Every structure is written in C-alpha cells, then in structure tokens.
Amino acid sequence: MNRDDPRLTYNHPYKPYDIQVQLMDAIYDTIQNKYKVGLFESPTGTGKTLSIICSSMTWLRNYKKTQDHSTMGSNSSNDNDPNQTSDSDEEPDWVKEAHIKNIRSRTSGLAIDYERHLEELSQTPHAGHTVELGQRTHKRKKRATNDDDFLPDDYNSDTDSNSVETKNAKLQQEINQIMKRVDGSDGKTPGFVNTCPVTIFFSSRTHSQLSQFAHQLSITSFESSLGEIAERIKFMPLSSRKQLCIHPKVSSLSSVSAVNDACVELQQKSDKRCEFMPRVNNPESDQLVQRFADYSFAVIKDIEELHELGADLKVCPYYASRRNIENSEIIALPYQMLLQQATRKSLGLSIKDSIVIIDEAHNLLDVISSINSVSITRKELSSVIASLKLYYNKFTKRLNSGNRIHLMKLIKLCSLVETYIKNCEIQNKCVPGSDVLIDELFQGSTGDLLNIHRIEKYLDKSKIAYKIQTYIEQSREESDEKQASSPLLFKVTAFLKSLVNPSKEGRFFWDKINDDTEIKYLLLDPSEMFRDVVESARCVLLCGGTMEPVEDYYRYLFPYVPGEKIKKFTCGHIVPQENIEVLTVSSRKTTVFDFSYHKRNDPSMLRELALSLQDICERVPNGIIVFAPSYKYLNQLISTWRKDGNLAKISTLKQVFLESSDSTSIESILRDYGAAARGSGAILFSVVGGKMSEGVNFSDELARAVIMLGLPYPNAFSGELIAKRKFIEETTLSKGGTQAMAKKNSREYYENICMRAVNQSVGRSIRHANDYSVIVLFDTRYNSSHIQSKLSGWMRSSIRPERESFDMTLERIADFFAAKTLTKR
C-alpha cells in the first residue's frame, strides 16, 4: 500500500508513523461502520490529536461528497408533514431528477460563492472592518458603583406576569429571533446551503487543551466536497461567558456563575443593557453578527482569538458564535457544555447523529460524577449565613416584600442545614461514607415557610446570589479582608438545588474535610447521565493517552451498549522498544519494598529506598522524576531523609526539587528544575494526581528516569470512595450477583483508579520518537501478573517478566544509558 498517497494517510500534514496510520484506520472504521462507541488509547507523544483530526475530517469530507447535497431537494417541500402527498409524486422520474439536479447546482454554486467570500476575508485583517453601531460612537464612561447596583429587581410572586421569569423567557425569545434573522440576512450564506450534514464535536478537559486542538487543526487541509475549489475547515470553538465576555465590568467578575448572572441582568435592563449584545430588528447588528460568523470561518481561531474578534467588531462573541453552530464541521467545547443536556439545550446544540470525540477520556467517569455533584461544609454554611444577614440588614428597607420574604426563608433554610450538621456531630452520626437522611434534615420544620421549591425558583430567577456576592466582595475589598477562593453563595445555591431535584443515581453522604464536616451529594452512576450522549450521537469516540484498565468504561459508563457495537484499539508507542526500559524493584538486599498502608513507614525500607535512589542518581544523566503516592507521604519521606542525612547525600548527586501542594509555585519549580536537569542534573519529587502528573510533559533531559514509589491507591476512608464502593456492591447484588462478586467488583474499581493514576503519571515522560527513558517501579506488588495486566500496553511489552536482584537492575540502567551515549557518537 502506497502510504505517500494523502488519501491513504487521511491527508495528514506530515508523513505519519505506522502506529498513527493504524489509529486513523481504526477511527475511520469506527465512524464508517457505525460502531456506537470507540475506545482508543494512543500514548502521550504519539501525535494523537492530529490522528483524530485527520481521520474524522477525512471521513466527513468523503461523506459530504457522497451526500452531494442530496437532502436539499427533500428540504424544499413537505418538511413539516411527511404524510402529505405532493404533486411531484405524480411526475415522471426524469422530471424529479432534473428538479433535484437544479437544486444541487444552485446550492453548490452558493456554497462555492461563500468559499470565495471567505478567501477574500482571510486576506483582510478584520480589525480594519469594524462596523460601529450608531449608539456606540460615544466614548464609554466608567460608571461608579453605588448601592443601587446591589439591589435585585422587585420580586412579587411566583405567578406574576411581570416577574423575572417572564423577562428571562422574553429575553431568550429575542436571542433566538436575532439568530434566525442573521441566518437569512445575507444572500451569500443561506443557512440551508452551508448546514453540515454531520458535525464533529471535540471535547476536552481544559481550555489550553482546546486551544492546542485549534492550533493542530490549523495546520491541516482536506479534499473539498465542492469539486475544484478549496473548501475551508468550518471550525467553531465554544466556551463559557467567563472566557468570551468582552464587557469590561462583567468579564472582571471572579466566577463563572457571577458572570452568567451579571450578563443576564444587563440584558434585562433597558437603561443598562449590554452594548455588545446583538439586537433584535437592527440591520447593523445583524450585519455585525454575520461579519463575526464569516471572519471566524475565514481563518481557524481559538477561544482567545474569537474573544479578540468580538472585541474588534464590538459584538458579543458568546452570542455571535452561535450563528456558526449549524454550519460548523467541527465544534470544540469543554466537557461541561457537552455533557450537560440543559447546557446543550440553552445553546441550541444538537448532537443527534453527530460524531462526538472526548479527549483525555481516562478521567471521564470522574468528570461526569463531579459536574453532577455538589457539597457544602458547616463552616461554609456559617460564612454564607453571615453574608446573607449582612446583606439583608443593609438593604432591608429598600427591598420589596417579595425579596425580603424569600431572603428570610433562604437564611432560615441555611440555618436549618447548619443546625442539622451540628446536631449530627454531637450524636456522632457524621461517619464518612454513611448516608445523610434528608428527611431528618427537615423534620419538624414548617413546610410553608421552607418550601424549597419556591426558594430554589427564587434563586434561579432573581439572580440574587450574584447581587449578594458582588456586594460582599466589594465590602471585603474596601476593608482589605481576604476573599474566599470561590464564591460560597453560588456553592450553597447549587447545594440547595440538589435538595430539590436529587437524581436517583446519586446519594447524599457524610465526609470530613480537615476538621470540618461536609454533606456531599455524589452522582454514583454516571452511565445514565452519559446515555443521552451515546444514544443521540452517531458514534462516541473516547480517546486518551492512558485508557487502561478499560473494564470500568464497559461496566460503569455504557453498560447498555452491546459488545459488538464497541470498538477498542490500543496502539503501541511511537518510541522504539530499545528506547524504553521498564524495571520492577521488589527488594534491596534483605529489605522488601512494600508501600502498602501499614508497611510504608518501615524505617529500614525508607533507608534502603534512599540508598537505592542514590545508586540510580549515579547512573542516570540529567533529570529524574520520582512519584510518591500522596503529598503527606512525600513530606514524611523528605522529613525522614533530612534527619538521617540521606537527603543531603542525594543532593550531592542531583539538585533536589519538591512539588508543592501550592499550585502557584509550579511554574517556578519547573523552570528551575528544567535548567538544573539540562545542566548538572536534578531530581524532582512529585505526587501522583498532583499538577506534575496530570498537566506537565517531561521530555528528553527532563525525565531520563521515572520512578514510581508504590501503588497510589486513593484514600480508602474518604466518604466519596466508601459511598461509591457501597453503591457498586449494592448494584451487583441487585442484578443477581453473589456477595463475593460484589466485593470483587468493588475491589476492581478501587484498583483501577490506582492503575490509571500510575499509567497517567508515567505517561508524561516520553514525548517523541527519539526520546528515551528508564521507568522504575518500586514495589513487590508490581511483579504480580494481575497488576501488570493493568499497565499501559507499551509498558507491558517492555517489562521484564523475571524477578531480578537490585544489582542487576542497576546494571541494566547503566547499560541502557551507555548504549545511548554510544549511539550519539
């Protein structure tokens, strides 16, 4: 097979490696043959993102060519009534074919005209084409904040026709009207011409990962579905108001919730309406939105560039970007937007028959649970109650009766929950993992006074949380009081809402956070929340660098999908076998390395571990990364070695760096470590699950060795894990399983969390084809075939099956780097 043919390499911008072609083959096959779910593991550094882009976009362009706009003919009539008989049914076939051919020709011609239009725009800086609305010609004056800014609209009753709810509904109608007007506002870009028959949704965890995706997409191009003329990739990144808002005052707010509420409030007030918001029945505004849409398609843009485009054109990028949703071939969006049905609905985002690609999917189970889970501690409740009382006392005379009554009910409700926690503490009921009995919480309370549904509706419709939070923040600024790291009132609001609508797949339970008591609502069964995505989409592709072990996805994410509709593919590493050495260390002399909970602090083992690290430091050039199972254990190690002098001995061989739990110091530590590693050498002690193990890539001299200390099992005594394992056992038994099976499934889940963390941490080390590294796994349990079966495939294939002495391990390390030195010569 000639892999130089771009059609056989999926239009990859470079000559792909064999493993990249294999991955692209697997993805294309999954989409083409309508598998419902695809699981793809491609080790970090193997060009996974480009492989995903090239295979999926090649399929889409091929699909568009075969469709040949054939749906256009059927869309032109009888769309709303499929049972209606058309006059054309009586016409001869040649007449129908001629009619459809005429429509295809016309729509194809318009699409080609639009491509030419985009080509012209791509040559012209958008900043020079700003259209100023008449009302925007004056210079904006900064308005001083006064107490009126902190007052909510009058809130009269739940049925008032002039209520905030009515205003919100009217506002949504206006937004929809704007988008519909724009869809037909320019003859060059009628919506039905450019609507993509299938949309690719790419979702990832972080903003930076989505930006990286946009940059990778920008270096690709694909065969046109329009014939001779080049066809641009129609890409649209979506994000929150917090990322896209260009209003100076609103965008400076501290949280996503505050920005959302402030945005809605500005749209409701005629005298303070956001000047960047698209307007109804305003041709100039329609023109701006259309211009924004065209420029965003002319050149691929990430979120920052989309924000800049909106600022230059003086139109809200959050709302204007909706114009391109139907016409996009690829949409990039964060997990929260994709995985929450209500969010997709509010954006007008349909994933029906689409291709959904979820990157970094190794943490998908946790992500789905976390975005549907909330918690509150007793101390947080106390702080919120104090804030509510402060606000109420300040503004009580200026609030109408509706606001006063509902605020008092909110204060009473928060006080009720706080008192319940205090009483349970006294009675020793707050055992981590044990159920919180919500019925007990409201026992003896006045139902009318504490109608949670009405309070929840008031919080949702009045946006009072934003008003109170901004007032409290300003009060703290004026008094130089330190602000909380996250707006607590929004957190309490989310918790109270969970009391109203708890999912049957979730559970309320107790937990302990330091010396504070927490009530947590946790989604225990993410499969039902994910079902809507799986059943709506054409196919869902879960991709990641470290997907092993995969059993949990089958069991807890899509148990309702038949096995024959799931495709699993694991590709090898881009790095040749001779560039990887995976070694297990069970013992040194007579000391066995066992980092299980009850043995990890054995003094003789810690001493032998320090000596082992010194031996490895003498044989490994440049940088070494050591992963400990937790910050607490790392601190214990360092403290012990400081006292016995072993840390000083290690520091004579490599400059020592420690990961801090304070994320603000990460960049400076990495910078200094990198300089030392490339120089005389350095060793970085890091933590599994910390910043270094998740988001940082260690290539070349930064990680000539990666050392894993023990198996990083999560805290078995955390309330969350106890509740989850209990749920797994109950579910197994409810399906007819035995007690032994229930315990086994619970143990497997616990073990799989640990092994995914191992794979994720080790996977940060080797980044490209010429990279090389030694991986050393310290713990006798790594010699178990059961544990080894859960390692990433590329590690399993490199691990030595036989147990060896530590001296032999050192010899292998020395030989490995000696061979690399000879190769360089």
From Swiss-Prot:
[4Fe-4S] cluster binds at residues 245, 263, 274, 316. Disulfide bonds: none annotated. Its cofactor is [4Fe-4S] cluster. Its main location: nucleus. The keyword Iron applies. A motif (DEAH box) lies at residues 359-362. It is found in: Nucleus. GO terms for biological process: establishment of sister chromatid cohesion; interstrand cross-link repair; mitotic G1 DNA damage checkpoint signaling; mitotic sister chromatid cohesion. Residues 69-86 have a biased composition (Polar residues). One of its GO terms (cellular component) is nucleus. ATP-dependent DNA helicase important for chromosome transmission and normal cell cycle progression in G(2)/M. May have a role in changing DNA topology to allow the loading of proteins involved in maintaining sister chromatid cohesion in the vicinity of the centromeres. Has a specific role in chromosome segregation during meiosis II. This is ATP-dependent DNA helicase CHL1. It comes from Meyerozyma guilliermondii (strain ATCC 6260 / CBS 566 / DSM 6381 / JCM 1539 / NBRC 10279 / NRRL Y-324) (Yeast).
